[in-house]
Amino acid sequence: MAPTLQDLTPSAGMKKTLQDEIEAILQERIMVLDGGMGTMIQRHKLSEEDFRGQEFKDHARPLKGNNDILSITQPNVIYQIHKEYLLAGADIIETNTFSSTSIAQADYGLEHLAYRMNMCSAGVARKAAEDISLQTGIKRYVAGALGPTNKTLSVSPSVERPDYRNITFDELVEAYKEQAKGLLDGGVDILLIETIFDTANAKAALFAVQKLFEEEYVPRPVFISGTIVDKSGRTLSGQTGEAFVISVSHADPLCIGLNCALGAAEMRPFIETIGKCTTAYVLCYPNAGLPNTFGDYDETPHVMAMHLKDFAVDGLVNIVGGCCGTTPDHIREIAEAVKNCKPRVPPATVFEGHMLLSGLEPFRIGPYTNFVNIGERCNVAGSRRFAKLIMAGNYEEALSVAKMQVEMGAQVLDINMDDGMLDGPSAMTRFCNFIASEPDIAKVPLCIDSSNFAVIEAGLKCCQGKCIVNSISLKEGEDDFLEKARKIKKFGAAVVVMAFDEEGQATETDPKIRVCTRAYHLLLKKLGFNPNDIIFDPNILTIGTGMEEHNLYAVNFINATKVIKETLPGAKVSGGLSNLSFSFRGMEAIREAMHGVFLYHAIKFGMDMGIVNAGSLPVYDDIHKELLQLCEDLIWNRDPEATEKLLHYAQTQGKGGKKVIQTDEWRNGPLEERLEYALVKGIEKYIIEDTEEARLNQEKYPRPLNIIEGPLMNGMKIVGDLFGAGKMFLPQVIKSARVMKKAVGHLIPFMEKEREETKVLTGKIEDEDPYQGTIVLATVKGDVHDIGKNIVGVVLGCNNFRVIDLGVMTPCDKILKAALDHKADIIGLSGLITPSLDEMIFVAKEMERLAIKIPLLIGGATTSRTHTAVKIAPRYSAPVIHVLDASKSVVVCSQLLDENLKDEYFEEILEEYEDIRQDHYESLKERRYLTLRQARENGFHIDWLSEPPPVKPTFLGTRVFEDYDLQKLVDYIDWKPFFDVWQLRGKYPNRGFPKIFDDKTVGEEAKKVYDDAQNMLQALISQKKLQARGVVGFWPAQSIQDDIHLYAEGAVPQASEPIATFYGLRQQAEKDSASSDPYLCLSDFIAPLHSGIPDYLGLFAVACFGVEELSKAYEEECDDYSSIMVKALGDRLAEAFAEELHERARRELWGYCSGEQLAVADLRRLRYEGIRPAPGYPSQPDHTEKLTVWRLADVEQRTGIRLTESLAMAPASAVSGLYFSNLKSKYFAVGKISKDQIEDYASRKNMSVAEVEKWLGPILGYDTD
């Protein structure tokens, strides 16, 4: 049983003594925290049995990797780790409790042990600290670590349901409360809430801790440490560092800082930010640098110590330590490095006199802040549109109201769900959760507005930022008022206090002042409320009602505001503006004018903020003079007839509007400007007309070539410059190229005529080349994918390069012949599938053999800088350069062809690639692999006898789907890869579809391309320009070790020969010692032959036909944009076909999930049961396995989908794979494998080792050269 407050308080103020003790040290020197616990546990290489110990030897779930259980099962190991850190110089050690909440432990089935786990961990750390304190004579401290849990309050686990949460605030509070009790009972000195990726979770932890300190325990010092996940300077849930500090400072932490995710060098700017916005001490315990490609940490103790010493010398820190990858050696060096450095001196105040609020971003309201607009339209009582949407349950559309308010200038967003037909707490929770999913809205603080305190609490539990509560009052007396205010303070919110007490609503000036003054002193004296967090609403009441007693309501508010601001330091004044003009509802022009006039004066008297319709407030000086005077008279009560006069004004004034007239004003400019404008804007309409006008101007352009070299190239140069500067995007560039091609196409007949005439006159042909250089592009032999290559060609063409595009499946000899025939300056090779890599190596070898010494560019989805540097560049003595995408191609080609730059550029590439090769070969030496036998022993072993029996498909054999309805596939299209084709990538928080449309940089262009795609898609479907065909098949199947055998229908597998075999590859790269993950192979998901349990395997192949023909037709019309668009859509339709057919397989064709009801977004997040891995991809990287699919289902004969010699599918818009139904099956990557598996695999497949190595080159864990 937990001790009571009385038990733990033998004398005055333990917290004061302990906090003062630590604070005294912090004022004298920099303290040192310990390093990574997980890192040290891994060094012990503990087995599953070690993790289980005797107590848990029969536990149903694996426990290896559950480091926290070791405090119970292996306390000596944890004690020794603590001791090592203490002897290395740590002043403070953290308990081994990062995942010791019931929430995190539920993954291991140990949630019932959370309290015990924490108490034991605290006890182990306490003993280590006391032993070393006694040994060294230096007191050491124990910090009880409260980790973030594996669930989040601010982010939905479901893309389709942004309002859904799989944990509640109250559940988190209870879990943290249980954890903190165990830590406190175990004897910790400090509570450290750490690795905060979601501030809402941290606020739940702080709420729990504060509750314990209030009710049961003597308070301890609290440390808070957030985690900035990348260089954007934000937490995983999107908050900036300053917003994070504002959100948690209500808990009065002794220390606040950052840990994890970043190395010290990367963390520095964010630690500086933390220090500038807190009066607390600053702690900093980064990782040992950034993780390498294997997820390990390489930063040496010395390097890390020097970084942290720089922090200390510059006065940034009070406590330093280490997180992931750090060891006692790191802590020893860090302690030595900072021991003579002076600690940071915390400022006495920060942002003095400011109200500090936060959403994802900070918002400071100070003496010089302009009037703060609190957006009013997200109020079911104040906005008919919003109310209608909420009542209909259309919360996503209601978000648009919130977004519009922010866009129109609302700095805070008021949310009100008070309606008798609504479940207020539920509606508030749901809408606030929706807001959290939209960073453009969530960036501003929220004002949780309700007359029902249960609704207010519901809203507060959803907000990771520091928000405003609107409102509380003295209406129900002081006890009720203080109870609510105490809760609000515990949530860390500011509060609006209404001028309302036991006697009712204050309408006169003096009662307003009296009620507000009373409330102010209660909050400060009884609760220690920060005066800067108090907002008074002295009641803006309706004027112009026709009742004389209402005429002074505006004047009374303004006068009360002046006194409140003069006599209640720090307090702010707000009010609901729409109340003022309620008598004039329906007369929006009058109401807006009244609001503008009222605010003009109220702000002068000290009103700080107001709930307004952001964006609809007129400027005082812009109000019509007659209307202005009438409003002034009404507000100041200067004319008893003011109301009647305003009504008369409204009735006599008509409404006017303006028409927006669009003109083609650019058409009035000079010819050259018109040509350039058309090219830059991608306007085709007049290009032939203008080009012909230029051609007819023989005086200025005597030859057609002069037009190309002059205004057309000038326009394309502007396009290239804008694209290079990131001010123009790929779809726009391609539209510009389309215009250019039409112009050039118009001129070509005239140029050919001129050439013939020259030949007749002189007997020879002029050698003209206006281009910057000639580049031959080709997709290599056996590969049919060319969207990326085509885009590169268009971009290069726009930058004055002559591009010779040889298309797809181009043999080496054809590539080299074209390069010689066209006197190419550069060759560019493209490929998507892994066999293309070998073909690229072959081309490089041939170029070397034939002494064709021109630069070779390598690109395509399967290529990489490492493969280019290691496998291709050594075969060729001229430049070989990997090009990431079209935007990089121009820069690379320009440098390679610039006489002044090319040699230096080539030298840089040689040095860079040599470094890459060295790193690669070093990494091969360091990698460790299990033997194939060990990997199989540690495979994924399903207890088939206890599993539900596999479902038999509704048919065995194959079924063909002819001319599949494309309209059915549209909803299954995943649009993200579509935007990747066009190199349109939104930045956080606007990544993915449809958020990309909100991106400030690419959003507008993305929407245009998407609209073009929708138009083309509907035309393709309605005009039946494309056809979809596919085949699905199912067979009895059993696994034998790593292979899957298929059998004829009706055969008894144990007594029959298989009709086909799919050969599997198993993971071999050694996993982290703390990991209990199995070494997977696809065969693990099929019942073994010896089990006697019948199982089944499915396969499919689908394609979209007609794409190539349409694309070619567009190219012949000089329309690259439409050519690329139809290919991109063809690929999307093929993938959608695969997705839709897999759904049908699960629900009806196989029927193992007949009741499945998943949203499309859940399909993309792989939330369905079973998998559909494809040969040639991570779970089975061998493309030769496609041959078995094709033979078994007679794919080419039945569908027309064929395989090239490199086993690419043709047409390119095609997808194929296998169907697995086991509920435990999952996607995985085989990763690198060692030679013993290659030899075994070659033997099973009856192939030579060399042939297998050729097909599996990218996953070989050894070098074959």
UniProtKB/Swiss-Prot annotation:
GO terms for molecular function: cobalamin binding; methionine synthase activity; zinc ion binding. Binds 1 zinc ion per subunit. Gene3D superfamilies: Cobalamin-binding domain (3.40.50.280), Cobalamin-dependent Methionine Synthase, domain 2 (1.10.288.10), Dihydropteroate synthase-like (3.20.20.20), Homocysteine-binding-like domain (3.20.20.330), Methionine synthase domain (1.10.1240.10), Vitamin B12-dependent methionine synthase, activation domain (3.10.196.10). SMART domains: B12-binding_2. Its cofactor is methylcob(III)alamin; Zn(2+). Its EC number is 2.1.1.13. Residues 923-1265 form the AdoMet activation domain. Pfam families: B12-binding, B12-binding_2, Met_synt_B12, Pterin_bind, S-methyl_trans. Residues 662-759 form the B12-binding N-terminal domain. (6S)-5,6,7,8-tetrahydrofolate binds at residues 382-384, 449, 470, 537, 579, 585, 591. Its main location: cytoplasm. PROSITE patterns: ADOMET_ACTIVATION, B12_BINDING, B12_BINDING_NTER, HCY, PTERIN_BINDING. Zn(2+) binds at residues 260, 323-324. Keywords: Amino-acid biosynthesis, Cobalamin, Cobalt, Cytoplasm, Metal-binding, Methionine biosynthesis, Methyltransferase, Phosphoprotein, Repeat, S-adenosyl-L-methionine, Transferase, Zinc. Methylcob(III)alamin binds at residues 709, 782-786, 830, 834, 886. Residues 772-907 form the B12-binding domain. NCBIfam families: metH, PRK09490.1. Belongs to the vitamin-B12 dependent methionine synthase family. Catalyzes the transfer of a methyl group from methylcob(III)alamin (MeCbl) to homocysteine, yielding enzyme-bound cob(I)alamin and methionine in the cytosol. MeCbl is an active form of cobalamin (vitamin B12) used as a cofactor for methionine biosynthesis. Cob(I)alamin form is regenerated to MeCbl by a transfer of a methyl group from 5-methyltetrahydrofolate. Monomer. Dimer. Forms a multiprotein complex with MMACHC, MMADHC and MTRR. PANTHER family: METHIONINE SYNTHASE (PTHR45833:SF1). This is Methionine synthase.
